[in-house]
Amino acid sequence: MAAVGSGGSNAAAGPGAVSAGSLEPGTASAAHRRLKYISLAVLVVQNASLILSIRYARTLPGDRFFATTAVVMAEVLKGLTCLLLLFAQKRGNVKHLALFLHEAVLVQYVDTLKLAVPSLIYTLQNNLQYVAISNMPAATFQVTYQLKILTTALFSVLMLNRSLSRLQWASLLLLFTGVAIVQAQQAGGGGPRPLDQNPGAGLAAVVASCLSSGFAGVYFEKILKGSSGSVWLRNLQLGLFGTALGLVGLWWAEGTAVARRGFFFGYTPAVWGVVLNQAFGGLLVAVVVKYADNILKGFATSLSIVLSTVASIRLFGFHVDPLFALGAGLVIGAVYLYSLPRGTAKAIASTSASASASTSGPCTHQQPPGQPPPPKLSSHRADLSTEPFLPKSVLVK
């Protein structure tokens, strides 16, 4: 079953509908390019806005909301949204929806239970992000959180036997160096620091969040290889587990305080903005990510770091010194280099070899006249088929 916004047949389209295959090449190319730009904007805004909104909501004067309740509310809203989308896919037929959910969730309970582990980790990760962002500037968190690329790569090598290119290993080393510089600047930076913030706790939380993100993402990919479930079904199943596990975490960590002050204690429009961003932002990204290749996603991450830094200067009085600029620059460069597909590196190497050969003698591999140029290398990797299943709203991609 095709997910809404995730492709599918055009057979149900009206007589005036135009299929992608009937478009002129130039029109189709322009439409695809426009979709890529829209995807880039969505990825950048979602990446930066969630972190900035959490930081803003957690540093406002007055009563502070319970982060565990925000995590639960985001899971509830995400699950309800996916349920409505599945209802729309069944053309509003309640009976068909009930039969479908009974088959997909209860009858195939083994597949459903497989999602309990990543859902538990994602729920823990969401709570850790609140702890981290509450104890370090948004820009510092955005840079440090890119360690999830390192942890994901390491878990991919260990759990999926995936190999990395030399360029990717070099970019991971560059990434770690950049994060270390930023954290050194954070630890030794001058200036007043709010008394209720603990940079050490923030760093521990973000490192734990990156470890959980890397493991959960790779584990999720491993168990869903060959799965036929749609984006919305998988996110609904994750939402069910996430809500239940989030309530357990709420009871364990802040149960007494929530019982005394109320579930929605400290909720303001800013807090609701955070909850809605977590719930709906990732679902939106799950739709547009099919138009974004690795390079575009790496570029979006780099732009979101820049946007978070600029916004932090304006909103929170964040000071950018040369050490932070150096570390952030290394991280941005590392993210971009890591996102380059292997074919690009090989193409660059072959281009360099051809250039050197042309200086020493005639080229023996010239393109014959009248023949079309060779096809361009694809920037998609083979393991991207499971990425739309990832709950982007909670991963701050």
From Swiss-Prot:
Record GO terms (molecular function): antiporter activity; UDP-galactose transmembrane transporter activity
GO cellular component: Golgi membrane
Membrane topology: Multi-pass membrane protein
Keywords: Antiport, Golgi apparatus, Membrane, Sugar transport, Transmembrane, Transmembrane helix, Transport
Regions crossing the membrane: 3-23, 37-57, 65-85, 97-117, 140-160, 169-189, 200-220, 238-258, 269-289, 315-335
GO biological process: UDP-galactose transmembrane transport
Intracellular or extracellular location(s): Golgi apparatus membrane
Cited SUPFAM superfamilies: Multidrug resistance efflux transporter EmrE (SSF103481)
Region (Disordered): 1-21, 355-397
UniProt xrefs under InterPro entries: Nuc_sug_transpt
Superkingdom of the source species: Eukaryota
Keyword Protein transport part of the UniProt annotation: no
Major localisation: Golgi
Reaction equations catalysed: UMP(out) + UDP-alpha-D-galactose(in) = UMP(in) + UDP-alpha-D-galactose(out); UDP-N-acetyl-alpha-D-galactosamine(in) + UMP(out) = UDP-N-acetyl-alpha-D-galactosamine(out) + UMP(in); UMP(out) + UDP-alpha-D-glucose(in) = UMP(in) + UDP-alpha-D-glucose(out); UMP(out) + UDP-N-acetyl-alpha-D-glucosamine(in) = UMP(in) + UDP-N-acetyl-alpha-D-glucosamine(out)
Low complexity biased stretches: 9-21
Family membership: Belongs to the nucleotide-sugar transporter family. SLC35A subfamily.
Role, per record: Transports uridine diphosphate galactose (UDP-galactose) from the cytosol into the Golgi apparatus, functioning as an antiporter that exchanges UDP-galactose for UMP. It is also able to exchange UDP-galactose for AMP and CMP, and to transport UDP-N-acetylgalactosamine (UDP-GalNAc) and other nucleotide sugars. As a provider of UDP-galactose to galactosyltransferases present in the Golgi apparatus, it is necessary for globotriaosylceramide/globoside (Gb3Cer) synthesis from lactosylceramide.
Quaternary assembly: Interacts with SLC35A3; the interaction is reduced in the presence of SLC35A4. Found in a complex with SLC35A3 and SLC35A4.
NCBIfam families in the record: nst
Protein name: UDP-galactose translocator
Taxonomic source organism: Canis lupus familiaris
Originating gene: SLC35A2
